[in-house]
């Protein structure tokens, strides 16, 4: 933990990124821009959203809107209710993977199911946490939602392996 703190604080850009997580308004035009715009986008959505395709943030205000900040766009276009549904879907995926890992017939299946589920859940947690401003912005895509070919292919392949392990369970 101490080494991670030292590495974070020695590189200037890492320090600025971490400090802007706590107070994005200290540098609103540079390191805090993405966090502020993500918050604005989510607040614009309200309870039911602005309508599918009606987001304003994705047209230049929020950088990497289709990849790193897709959760903010979902919240803006479809609202708080849809954002909660996305979180609920990830919880269901996590419970399915945990159940599969616990019921897998052999050790390999258990480890595969646990590893794939942990990977998908941590990636979702880090992305949503960064968009909400409770974690530093890291550039981790939101599994199964973010735009990007390699991430989508790897996630779908891993989920296919998880489904195969689930199929083998009694």
Give residue ranges: language-model regions.
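A juxtamembrane structural motif centered on a specific transmembrane helix
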Residues: 125-170
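Hydrophobic/aromatic residues in alpha-helical transmembrane segments
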Residues: 14, 90-97, 117, 130, ...
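Transmembrane helix-bundle signature of multi-pass membrane transporters/permeases
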Residues: 61, 73-76, 116-120, 148-151
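Alpha-helical transmembrane segments of multi-pass membrane proteins
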Residues: 4-7, 116-126, 160
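Generic alpha-helical transmembrane segments of integral inner-membrane proteins
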Residues: 1-5, 84-92, 156, 160
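Hydrophobic transmembrane alpha-helices and their immediate junctions
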Residues: 80-124
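Hydrophobic, glycine- and aromatic-enriched re-entrant/interface helices and adjoining loop segments
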Residues: 1-85, 105-109
């Amino acid at each position: 933990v101490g080494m991670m703190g030292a590495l974070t604080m020695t590189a200037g850009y890492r320090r600025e990124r971490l400090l802007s997580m706590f107070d994005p308004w200290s540098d609103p035009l540079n390191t805090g821009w993405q966090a502020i715009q993500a918050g604005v986008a989510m607040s614009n959505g309200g309870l039911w959203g602005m309508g599918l395709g009606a987001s304003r943030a994705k047209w230049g205000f929020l950088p990497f809107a289709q990849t790193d900040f897709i959760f903010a766009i979902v919240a803006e276009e479809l609202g708080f209710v849809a954002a909660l549904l996305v979180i609920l879907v990830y919880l269901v995926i996590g419970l399915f993977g945990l159940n599969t890992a616990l019921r897998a017939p052999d050790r390999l299946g258990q480890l595969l199911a646990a590893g794939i589920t942990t990977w998908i859940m941590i990636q979702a947690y880090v992305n949503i946490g960064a968009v909400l401003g409770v974690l530093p912005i890291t550039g981790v895509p939101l599994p199964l939602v973010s735009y990007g070919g390699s991430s989508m292919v790897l996630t779908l392949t891993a989920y296919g392996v998880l489904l195969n392990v689930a199929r083998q369970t009694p």
